[in-house]
């Protein structure tokens, strides 16, 4: 049979087609925003495609150096730096401007220098998201997000919850 788990690419493509098949191209929006703390731990710049007006698909870029890492509970060795790429999909629940935002995704972490410490290894972290989102109901406008992001840390074998605030522009 064509649709079995032996063909995950086909299953994935069918799921994407179903998810976005009803998307009205004229109602799809974009957003660019700055996030402090939250999913990228320190700060990040993010691009988001708002599909079907209620499904945000996000990719971002964040950065932390050794001095900043102390503030986020993960002290790195001297001169260590890490780039973070948060990728997520979510769901907006609400009417017009005020929404509950739920989401899930992962964070790719890339350390700039090799290290012997376990918390300084390249890898992927899983994350969730719950928060409040205000966005303009016009075609363009202001965007604000207040979020809680539980992030799974495999070294600690548990979740740490980070708060975040985002400010940006919807177009």
Could you describe each region identified by the protein language model?
Residues 40, 86, 148-150:
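Proline-rich low-complexity regions
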Residues 89, 159-171:
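Outer-membrane beta-barrel "beta-signal"
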Residues 38-40, 93-97, 171:
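A generic beta-sheet turn/junction motif
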Residues 31-46, 53, 62-64, 116, ...:
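Solvent-exposed loop/turn segments connecting transmembrane beta-strands
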Residues 48-146:
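Gram-negative (and chloroplast) outer-membrane scaffold detector with strong preference
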Residues 28-30, 147-150:
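Extracytoplasmic loops and strand-loop junctions of Gram-negative outer membrane beta-barrel proteins
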Residues 1-29:
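Cleavable N-terminal export/targeting peptides
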